[in-house]
Design a protein with these regions (language model features):
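Mid-domain catalytic core of redox enzymes
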Residues: 170-262
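Conserved beta-strand segments of alpha/beta enzyme cores
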Residues: 7, 32, 163-165
Length: 262
């Protein structure tokens, strides 16, 4: 949705990325992607850290200079956990150590899940990316960017000439749709799809508080995560930076839009 000349991600920030050339080539038939690279920042009690965890992060936390020094600090702190991790907290510490866990994982995760990390299962975190380089690119994907003009325009181009039915509940018309399509992609609640045969799942939702600000720059980055427990929101998105603060004519945008996520 365009507001004040800014393509505002109404349903949350999304950065397209893929390693599959076939997918990239297909979408480029319907849009042109800009060169946006996702490089989020973490704010822990007023201190800023680079994400994903990389040499900038380790230098800020420990003052280390070399990858060898960084890995030595991580290995030293990982030893705190003996045996199989029993919960998410122990799993995270066993992967990256307590300092990174306390500053950059604990508060953010507990706000996302609404649970203490000690009460969350360890399998939620299979691995945590640790980069012993000064690479701030969040994704490892070969192809990455934001569709110029927005995702809505891209989807409209894809759907041109295709029948679209809105406001239809697949589960109420399952037999009908199963007959007219070889493949169906279902994006509704998975427990409803199986008719709650294993019970009802718990769901977490995301709430956005959006503000239009009469300033040119609020935080200087598209995404800033707030990783302490005291700050109620998980992150702030400043939408204009997905397109480098420019309008479609390449002119600087005078205002900005931020979204606080809860």
């Amino acid at each position: 949705e365009k507001v004040e000349g800014i393509n505002y991600h109404k349903y949350g920030a999304h950065i397209f990325h893929t390693n599959i050339k076939e997918v990239w080539d297909y979408l480029n038939k319907y849009c042109t992607f800009n060169r946006f690279t996702n490089s989020p920042v973490a704010n822990y009690k007023g201190e800023l850290y680079s994400l994903p965890f990389n040499m900038y992060t380790f230098n800020k936390i420990w003052g280390v200079i070399t990858p060898e020094e960084a890995m030595a600090k991580i290995d030293e702190q990982r030893k705190e956990i003996i045996g199989e991790p029993r919960n998410l907290e122990e799993q995270a510490i066993s992967l990256v150590g307590r300092d990174i866990y306390e500053k950059l994982i604990k508060g953010y995760t507990e706000k996302q899940w609404g649970r203490d990390c000690k009460d969350l299962p360890s399998f939620i975190i299979k691995r945590l990316p640790v980069r012993l380089t000064f690479d701030n690119n969040y994704f490892n994907a070969l192809y990455q960017g934001i569709p110029i003009g927005g995702y809505t325009k891209m989807v409209e181009n894809i759907l041109d000439g295709i029948e679209v039915r809105l406001g239809v509940d697949y589960l109420k018309h399952r037999d009908e749709f199963d007959k007219i399509a070889d493949k169906i992609i279902y994006t509704g609640p998975i427990d409803a799809y199986f008719n709650y045969s294993l019970g009802t799942l718990e769901y977490r939702s995301v709430r956005f508080e959006n503000e239009v600000l009469d300033i040119p720059n609020y935080q200087g980055n598209a995404a800033v995560n707030y990783t302490d427990n005291e700050t109620p929101w998980t992150r702030i998105i400043e939408h204009k930076w997905f397109e480098f603060g420019k309008d479609e004519e390449g002119k600087d945008l005078r205002k900005t839009i931020i979204s606080k996520e809860y």
